Each structure stands twice: as structure tokens, then as C-alpha cells.
């Protein structure tokens, strides 16, 4: 990946609220299925905004920080997804998204970020990201002091 897109906690919350507003009315949803791990934080934000208490997970491993590798389903939520929002932080090449679509064909699949290759696989998203860009999520970063260029 040649570019990086840094996401801050406040921007993630703003994007999640925007997404939640598009998912109204909340009563139409039975619950949320978070794609672990990237969808866990967005799922918590959606659950809060939509006052949804039923939150489950589907655990799919396809990344090791910045390298994509073979996909493995570790745990899945029951059912075909009818009445459920499935959320992940992003859709990239579409590999994970296609697996989600196959597992939950009746779910409403959303992400915060979408890259061109995976965009057709989600029902809604908030931010377009170029395909060659790596997204740095706030849960993968820390805040560190940086000394000034000129010391007093």
C-alpha cells in the first residue's frame, strides 16, 4: 500500500453516527452482527446510537495488521442474517465481504469505509477510500509526545 489514511476516534464516531442515521428506523432491526475484529468498535457505536442490545459476532481472520492472508471462519452468528445489520470497519478487496454475503444473504451489510474493489458487496458505507490506501484505525495506534523542531 502506497498511501495511508489515519482515522481518529472522533472521526470514527462521527462516521458511525452518520451511518446509524441511515439505518433508521431502529425498530426494523433484530440486532447487529459485528465482523471481528474490525467491526467490533463500529458495532458498539451503532448499538449505542440505535439502542440495539442484541449484538453477535462473526469471527473471520484475513489480515495480520498490514498483510492480507488466507481467510478462516473461526465463529459465526446463527441464521441467514434476516433483520440484522452486519458491520465491518471497511470493505477492501471484497474477499471477506463475499464470505459475509454467502453466510448472511438476507443481512444488511454496512461498513464505515469502502474501497472500489469491494464497494459493490456492501449495502451502504460512509467514506470512499482509494484501493491502494492502508487505513490506520484508532485502535491500532497510540498517542505519543513528539518533541518540537526547535528546543527552547
From Swiss-Prot:
GMP binds at residues 69, 92-96, 134-135. Its cofactor is Mg(2+). One of its GO terms (biological process) is GMP salvage. Keywords: Cell inner membrane, Cell membrane, Glycosyltransferase, Magnesium, Membrane, Metal-binding, Purine salvage, Transferase. Xanthine binds at residues 92, 135. It catalyses: GMP + diphosphate = guanine + 5-phospho-alpha-D-ribose 1-diphosphate; XMP + diphosphate = xanthine + 5-phospho-alpha-D-ribose 1-diphosphate; IMP + diphosphate = hypoxanthine + 5-phospho-alpha-D-ribose 1-diphosphate. SUPFAM superfamilies: PRTase-like. 5-phospho-alpha-D-ribose 1-diphosphate binds at residues 37-38, 69, 88-96. Guanine binds at residues 92, 135. The keyword ATP-binding does not apply. Pathway: Purine metabolism; GMP biosynthesis via salvage pathway; GMP from guanine: step 1/1; Purine metabolism; XMP biosynthesis via salvage pathway; XMP from xanthine: step 1/1. It is an enzyme of class 2 (transferase). It is a peripheral membrane protein. Belongs to the purine/pyrimidine phosphoribosyltransferase family. XGPT subfamily. This is Xanthine-guanine phosphoribosyltransferase. It comes from Erwinia tasmaniensis (strain DSM 17950 / CFBP 7177 / CIP 109463 / NCPPB 4357 / Et1/99). The gene is gpt.
